[in-house]
């Protein structure tokens, strides 16, 4: 029977998705995230018992590695990557190593216990893939396998992206999802009525994970996933382009986004920490976009831009 080793990273909540990705890149086969915020306002809808958890901005991300992994080497690499993330302005922390060995079935039980269905927007609820869930009238359920490290859709940047997509889509649109990760924004776009969605990610792992999550959701055959470096080489025009990635990367795609967004179309940018906000705004304005909506949650910002000649309905118009 295969056994597993644990590596736990204690970081600020804002770094959740970036650090989870680092752990997968170093060979982790899955992660579990313990976040006190997950228990805020939880209700025992079906008789669940939720623990009394002290609230903190810090979270614990536990990664699981095969027993053959050299954890000393992995820890060095993780610390180097955390230092790089810190240079981007993300709040990170120190690595603690727990070399406890777990049987494979124990590992599965360990990480699954952290996840519950979560209502993200008015219409969208994210549900772990193994959970039976009875949706209410009008509720759109996104099935995700959060054990694949790209987040559960509950991070502030993802929440704001989902809210923006929900507000914009009316049905029949073409959507491009840049840096798709788990595929959650593409799945949401499909459920909200988009006609065709193109999902791109530079990471082959993300491409695979996104496709696996898409396959969990019925009626999402209109999502096309492919490896891609932002919008380079893309010629397909879109009504909406959405990107939830680091600000330093967002500024590299605004010109291509303007080229591809149809007139009266939208560009949704999220993943922007406050200190990088002006940089992203400048890049989008320089490309020709007008700002329509600015959302803020904690230190995170999401921006909705419009490609239009009629600026009466946009900020500053």
Swiss-Prot record:
InterPro entries reported for this sequence: Ribosomal_L11_MeTrfase_PrmA, Ribosomal_PrmA_MeTrfase, SAM-dependent_MTases_sf
GO biological process, alphabetically ordered: methylation
Annotated Gene Ontology cellular components are:
cytoplasm
Record-level Gene Ontology MF annotations: protein-lysine N-methyltransferase activity
Record keyword Transferase present: yes
Task: List UniProt keywords, sorted A-Z.
Answer: Cytoplasm, Methyltransferase, S-adenosyl-L-methionine, Transferase
Q: Does the keyword Transferase apply?
A: yes
Q: Which PANTHER family match?
A: ELECTRON TRANSFER FLAVOPROTEIN BETA SUBUNIT LYSINE METHYLTRANSFERASE
Could you tell me what this protein is called? Ribosomal protein L11 methyltransferase
Native source species: Streptococcus pyogenes serotype M4 (strain MGAS10750)
Recall the taxonomic lineage recorded for the source organism: Bacteria, Bacillati, Bacillota, Bacilli, Lactobacillales
């Amino acid at each position: 029977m295969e056994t597993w080793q644990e590596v736990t990273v204690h970081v600020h909540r804002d770094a959740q998705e970036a650090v989870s990705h680092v752990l997968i890149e170093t060979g982790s086969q899955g992660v579990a995230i313990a976040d006190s915020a997950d228990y805020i306002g939880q209700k025992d809808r079906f008789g669940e018992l939720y623990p009394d958890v002290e609230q903190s901005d810090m979270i614990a991300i536990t990664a699981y590695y095969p027993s053959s992994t050299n954890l000393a080497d992995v820890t060095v690499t993780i610390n180097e990557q955390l230092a790089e993330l810190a240079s981007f302005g993300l709040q990170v922390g120190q690595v603690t190593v727990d070399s406890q060995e777990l049987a494979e079935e124990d590992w599965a039980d360990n990480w699954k216990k952290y996840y519950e269905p979560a209502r993200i927007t008015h219409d969208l609820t994210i549900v772990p893939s193994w959970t039976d869930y009875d949706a209410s009238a009008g509720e759109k359920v996104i099935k995700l396998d959060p054990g694949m490290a790209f987040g559960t859709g509950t991070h502030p940047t993802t929440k704001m992206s989902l809210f923006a997509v929900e507000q914009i889509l009316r049905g029949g649109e073409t959507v491009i999802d840049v840096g798709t990760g788990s595929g959650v924004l593409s799945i949401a776009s499909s459920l909200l009525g988009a006609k065709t969605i193109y999902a791109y990610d530079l990471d082959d792992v993300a491409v695979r994970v996104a496709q696996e999550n898409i396959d969990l959701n019925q009626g999402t055959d209109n999502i096309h996933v492919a490896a891609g470096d932002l919008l380079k080489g893309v010629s397909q025009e879109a009504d909406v382009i959405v990107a939830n990635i680091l600000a330093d990367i967002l500024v590299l795609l605004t010109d291509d986004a303007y080229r591809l967004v149809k007139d009266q179309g939208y560009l949704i940018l999220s993943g922007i920490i406050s200190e990088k906000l002006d940089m992203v705004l400048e890049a989008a304005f320089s490309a020709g976009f007008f700002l329509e909506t600015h959302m803020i949650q904690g230190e995170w910002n999401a921006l909705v831009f419009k490609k239009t000649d009629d600026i009466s309905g946009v900020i500053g118009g």
